[in-house]
Amino acid sequence: MLQEPKVEFLWGDETAVYDDWIRHMARAPVGLPVENFNHQRTQPRKQTLIAAMSAEKVFAPWCFEGSLESDKMLQWLQQLRPQLHENHVLILDNARPHHACKVRGYLADHPIRILFLPPYSPHMNPIEKLWAAIKQRWRQRRLRGFPRLLATLQADLQQIVEKSGKAIVASCSYSSVLS
């Protein structure tokens, strides 16, 4: 009897990354100084980080200046596509660039199986928890500036997924896809 190949789910999303993780507002008990507080008022620079993850691996992490628009989404899909197999299914949220005409046109010519999450359901997207974990790690290390952040990006993402990927996916109610 022929067995169908097992489907492997990937979850994709983007997040904003700032080059200054130091808080600009803080509280302390009356009479005590605030520790680790940056009194300078600077405008942190923003970049967008986009990637896909499975329970075991991170796919096509990419960081760029500005926000995600259809052209950037298309570039990312072009980077991601060579890493995909026919049994992969990419799950995305409903951000506007994910549904753009350019993206739909590309997908018509270069089939990638995509499912969209229901509206307003970030709790169903494991990569949201990966983004929270990476940002927490960078804050704890007090890394500042994009060169320092990006130098550790690939290793940090892979390390978090290798250590906690299955738990992250299961925490989003996808435990049945892990077996």
Label every PLM stretch briefly:
Residues 34-42, 110-126, 143:
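RNase H-like polynucleotidyl transferase catalytic core
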Residues 13, 51-52, 77, 93, ...:
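Generic structural signal for small/hydrophobic residues in well-ordered secondary structure
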Residues 70-117:
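RNase H-like DDE/DDD metal-dependent nuclease/strand-transfer catalytic core used by mobile genetic elements
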